[in-house]
């Protein structure tokens, strides 16, 4: 028995030592974009060992001034998924840590409003409804208070459902796009709830060719609602879920989605697409390296893969 106890103590000490060593070995990053050399038209893993680790990282976004970088991290044993932040202070980036409201419940899929004053996200925190309490993935919002974030409150209650809802994004018009499993277990489709007269309407599923009989999710919609980038498990891809792009046509329908190709997509799953506020870089998550990591690539690929859509190039700043 004594040998067992000693062995457990040694294992615990080794675990703590490895954890501390991992923190101490974290690289010091300085300068814009966490000191990374900007990628060209070949995607690269973003900030390995600092942002992208052996755990799962997804849903990344910079603030407009480029001095804060937010993302979700999941897969740490015994801990919920959390929204993380690293900040550039005196030109040096702080070690990523959970934002002040995150770390108790599962929090993922953050969206920062363009002015940086509000964060909308998906959370499994407890919802009290009359005499009942439930935990469900719904949308919550926190307002910025100095360097911190305010108490979470529910967001767009008219649009959400008793099923799982994820990846909220709000456009300039106030319309809310997200994906939901309200079609039943194992399903996933992209929905839109319009913002009319100060309220959100009941969400409606986007028509084909955006949604299909297969799973669609994680839609990044441009602020003018003329471009949508999303993940889909439809046939014809490279495996898992692939990232596609579609543009709004003159008749208000969506163009046939284009697969973003095998530099971005792989035999694994790709999802969580975003574009940096300056329009220069395209970020996404992929499991192509064996764990969920954040990758980035020049946003010029969007114009190059769909040359006839050059009228949308102001969305993408390639210089």
Q: What are these model-predicted stretches?
A:
Residues 1-25:
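Bacterial Sec-dependent N-terminal signal peptides
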Residues 23-319:
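Short, conserved micro-motifs composed of acidic
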